[in-house]
């Protein structure tokens, strides 16, 4: 399920990038292997992708990047613990490929099989009653490889939060500022944990106007010599001002909830990473 959601987000980013060109490459033609990204040693200059490239997260390079963040920037693997993975029962249903539907805003139908390529899907898995009924991969993704989860991180953090609430380890009626004292003077200070989890906080934050500062705070790249802003997402959260009354309306801030969620979950169980990462 998480993988399916991940790929929906990946397509959204790709579509935005592709809208900039008159005739975008098809899913088949933009396949990273077909494009030849990072193949051979050393890869040719015109097929090399670096984190410092201004277009590393732009289509068609994006289709390679989303599976190779560990080669591009610092990150940390999260252990699944000593118990190991629990195998899922498999009962694949080939008939799903012929299921048809009418996309939003369209006049004609398409099949599930046709939608896979139309959405530039890298991979998808469908679970029904605990069984894998559909699983398919393309592009950079393989059954044993990694893929950026993007905003699915919010779903994972939200699920962990609800588990802690159910276990009595996280009080969703508590003020965020009491759970994390560093945030008491920020917009989060007088918001309840539940309001933050439900995205009903009133934040003076715009994904257009403020995203650059937010991204600069968490970027692993060196800051300019004259930079005086926050140097991590956690520092950035402390600068966010209130922009209304908490709890009155749902307002998704795509970049904002996840760093807070990670910080609050760690505070609730008093378990912290060995160092304070920026992301």
Which ranges hold each PLM region?
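Aromatic- and histidine-enriched alpha-helix N-cap/loop-to-helix transition segments
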Residues: 119, 150-156, 188-191, 251-258
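N-terminal leader/targeting segments and the immediately adjacent pre-domain N-terminus
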Residues: 17-141, 198, 202
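Active-site SXXK
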Residues: 130, 147-172, 196, 260-264
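Extended ligand-binding groove/face enriched in aromatic
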Residues: 120-121, 148, 183-237
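Solvent-exposed, polar/charged alpha-helical surfaces in well-ordered, non-transmembrane soluble domains
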Residues: 110, 114, 158-159, 174, ...
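Active-site helix/loop module of the DD-peptidase/beta-lactamase fold
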Residues: 143, 152, 166-208, 239, ...
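Bacterial N-terminal signal peptides
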Residues: 2-14
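Catalytic-site signature segments of enzymes, centered on catalytic residues
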Residues: 135-137, 143-144, 208-210, 218-279
């Amino acid at each position: 399920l998480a993988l399916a959601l991940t790929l929906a987000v990946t397509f959204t980013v790709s579509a935005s990038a592709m809208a900039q060109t008159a005739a975008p490459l098809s899913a088949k033609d933009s396949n990273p292997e077909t494009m030849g990204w990072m193949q051979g040693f050393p890869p040719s200059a015109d097929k090399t992708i670096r984190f410092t490239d201004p277009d590393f997260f732009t289509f068609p390079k994006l289709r390679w990047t989303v599976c190779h963040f560990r080669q591009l920037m610092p990150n940390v693997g999260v252990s699944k613990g000593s118990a190991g993975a629990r195998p899922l029962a498999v009962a694949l249903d080939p008939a799903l490929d012929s299921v048809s539907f009418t996309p939003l805003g369209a006049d004609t139908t398409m099949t599930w099989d046709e939608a896979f390529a139309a959405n530039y899907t890298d991979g998808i898995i469908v679970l029904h009653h605990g069984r894998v009924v559909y699983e398919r991969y393309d592009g950079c993704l393989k059954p044993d490889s990694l893929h950026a989860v993007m905003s699915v991180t919010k779903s994972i953090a939200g699920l962990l939060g609800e588990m802690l609430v159910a276990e009595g380890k996280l009080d969703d009626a508590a003020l965020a500022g009491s759970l994390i004292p560093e945030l008491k003077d920020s917009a989060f200070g007088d918001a309840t944990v539940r309001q933050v989890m439900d995205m009903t906080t009133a934040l003076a934050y715009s994904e257009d106007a403020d995203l650059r500062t937010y991204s600069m705070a968490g970027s692993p790249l060196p800051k300019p010599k004259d930079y005086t802003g926050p140097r991590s997402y956690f520092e950035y959260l402390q600068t966010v001002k209130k922009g209304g009354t908490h709890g009155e309306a749902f307002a998704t801030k795509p970049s904002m909830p996840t760093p807070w969620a990670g910080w609050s979950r760690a505070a609730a169980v008093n378990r912290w990473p060995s160092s304070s990462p920026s992301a």
